[in-house]
Amino acid sequence: MDAAFAAIPTEDISESIQNNIVVILQGLEKKIAINRQINQNLEAVIADVMDYKFLSNAETLPKRFIGDIASIKAGGDCPQEWSKYKTKDCQIPIYSNGTDNEGLYGYTKEPTILKRGITVAARGTIGYCTMRNGGYVPIIRLLAVTPNDIGGDVYLHQIFNRIKFRNDGSIQQQLTVPSLASIEIPYPNASTLKAFANITYPLIEKIKQNKIQIEELTKQRNELLPLLMNGQVSVNSDLADD
């Protein structure tokens, strides 16, 4: 934000307005940083619960192949009808193998994956994984993993974060559906996973809401800066104190 502050044409506005602009922008930045820190803490709690409940006694859990406990689908081409930004007609997120903005590529009309699960990057940053709500479209060979059990999405996400994925040995390095499906992991029973979901789903929902607020605050910050610079809106320093 220092660069943004420096870009404000201070010679054209009064010192008091300059100060208020800085206060507002710094307030928005502070809120964004706090939400990010809260999310990091919540993610750490989920990882700790995973370690305590399962990985501390992983040797006692049954071993299962990922292909037996979840469906795995590789994303295809981008839908013909899509938009880079959310529109009235295009509300369904499209995800690719990228890591920027958690792989969000754009939006389309109809989902191909209906249930909550995890996506795993099959190219580039192989193994980068993110939890997804149901109703999305994976593209460009991104692997969509949909667990059979409630709570399986959180469990597999934690497992994937701890796996060092290997590519399939081809010239173009990639992770394939068969290679992911053939990985054997410790896997608890359905009732234990459901209890795990009861603990972690509220935390995941809080993380989701914080991400939404971060997006809104970032948009507000980015829209507010040029308006303030051009004198098109009045300054209200109370925004920074909410």
Regions found by a protein language model. Give the residues of each.
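Non-catalytic DNA-recognition/assembly elements of restriction-modification systems
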Residues: D2, A7-D100, P186-N236
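DNA target-recognition domains and sequence-specific DNA-contacting regions of bacterial/archaeal
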Residues: M1-D12, R64-P188, L239-D242
